[in-house]
């Protein structure tokens, strides 16, 4: 098993445009920052309040960096970093439009991620809308 010795913000990530087992899906080499902007524009609304966009961008970056840090797909024998399939990862769309409200926040948070105290590894964060995706204790006060 390969796990990086430290958290690295990659210059580029390899996005497999399909499910992991689809050998016909194209691999795209995408600058990390552009990938995060694309995913955020594909997963959330640009009209949301700034705090909501910020929270979601942090979740996207943490999930992505967890895939990078743990070498998740490479440890399974694949030659990519992450997929575009929401069954496994985030929605990513080649050449999609990027909204300014999201782009600015990604630029501000570029190297940030969520982690537990005294744990270096970025958290594999979940998305929950309460309808299509259910998460334990979502929208509850603990």
Stretches with model-predicted labels:
Residues 1-142:
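Conserved, single-site charged/polar hotspot
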């Amino acid at each position: 098993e390969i796990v990086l010795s430290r958290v690295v913000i990659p210059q580029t990530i390899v996005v497999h445009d399909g499910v992991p087992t689809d050998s016909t899906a194209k691999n795209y080499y995408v600058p990390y920052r552009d990938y995060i902007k694309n995913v955020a524009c594909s997963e959330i609304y640009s009209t949301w309040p700034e705090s909501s966009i910020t929270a979601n961008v942090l979740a996207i970056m943490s999930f992505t960096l967890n895939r990078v840090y743990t070498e998740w797909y490479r440890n399974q024998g694949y030659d990519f970093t992450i997929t575009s399939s929401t069954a496994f990862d985030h929605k990513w769309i080649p050449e999609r439009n990027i909204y300014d409200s999201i782009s600015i926040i990604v630029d501000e948070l570029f190297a940030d991620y969520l982690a537990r105290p005294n744990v270096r590894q970025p958290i594999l964060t979940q998305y929950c809308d309460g309808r299509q995706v259910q998460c334990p204790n979502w929208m509850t006060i603990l």
